[in-house]
UniProtKB/Swiss-Prot annotation:
It comes from the Archaea. One of its GO terms (biological process) is F420-0 metabolic process. It comes from Methanocella arvoryzae (strain DSM 22066 / NBRC 105507 / MRE50). The gene is cofC. It catalyses: (2S)-2-phospholactate + GTP + H(+) = (2S)-lactyl-2-diphospho-5'-guanosine + diphosphate. Keywords: GTP-binding, Nucleotide-binding, Nucleotidyltransferase, Transferase. HAMAP family: CofC. This is 2-phospho-L-lactate guanylyltransferase. Disulfide bonds: none annotated. Guanylyltransferase that catalyzes the activation of (2S)-2-phospholactate (2-PL) as (2S)-lactyl-2-diphospho-5'-guanosine, via the condensation of 2-PL with GTP. It is involved in the biosynthesis of coenzyme F420, a hydride carrier cofactor.
């Protein structure tokens, strides 16, 4: 089984700019990618990365394409005649068990939705009869595409896999629930604050009341 992980090399996670510096965003993105690729490899999945410019990554083949995301991924599907996974690079809570549970499904298409109508992971057993359409309400689009092509589907319901890190408000899930290097790094540069009622991730220097989690991992 192969998995393709799209990864943006430059100007990564710009929607986290309200909290993190460009250097911090870049480091966090790389650590999330490391957590994800390590998890996939532990589940016996061969990892390939899809990027728009060359870079090196241990343990994965890097595929460079100048095309936009959808055309690049659809070219990839056309070039494969065996099952493949498409995994987004911002779901660092995904576990080996999550991956193995998806692989155990007999459905032609296994889809794990993201929050807000997106699609975080797809397992595609018939890439010759399927194409992707990311952005917008892509979960509904992918369910429709599968139905139109006569493919069976399973919606994989998982907190871990649905928790994508796009905006500053999403970081709370990684901070509290993360066990990998991305979470450790986030905890080293931020703290939790509940001075406004709902807990959120802030910078240490903020003049706010920090919340310490019992047993919180550091480092």
């Amino acid at each position: 089984m192969k998995a393709i992980v799209p990864f943006k090399v430059v100007n990564v996670k710009s929607r986290l700019a309200s909290l993190l510096t460009p250097e911090e965003r870049s480091e966090l993105a790389k650590l999330m990618l490391r957590d994800i690729t390590s998890t996939l490899a532990a589940a016996g999945v061969e990892v390939e990365l899809l990027t728009t410019q060359p870079f090196e990554w241990d343990g994965a083949t890097v595929i460079v394409s100048e095309k936009e995301l959808n055309p690049a991924l659809n070219d990839y599907l056309l070039a494969n005649d065996s099952p493949v996974m498409i995994v987004m690079a911002d779901i660092p809570l995904i576990t080996e068990k999550n991956v193995r549970d998806m692989l155990a499904s007999p459905a032609d298409i296994v889809i794990c939705p993201g929050r807000g109508g997106g699609t975080n992971v797809q397992l595609i057993r018939r890439p010759d009869k399927y194409h992707v359409d990311y952005y917008g309400a892509s979960f509904m689009d992918h369910m429709r595409i599968a139905q139109e092509n006569g493919l069976t589907t399973e919606v994989f319901d998982s907190f871990n896999v649905s928790s994508d890190i796009d905006e500053a408000g999403d970081l709370i899930e990684l901070y509290i629930h993360g066990k990998g290097d991305a979470a450790k790094y986030l905890r080293s540069i931020t703290v939790l604050d509940d001075s406004k009622g709902r807990v959120r991730v802030v910078k240490e220097e903020s003049n706010l009341r920090a919340v310490r989690i019992p047993g919180k991992m550091t480092g």
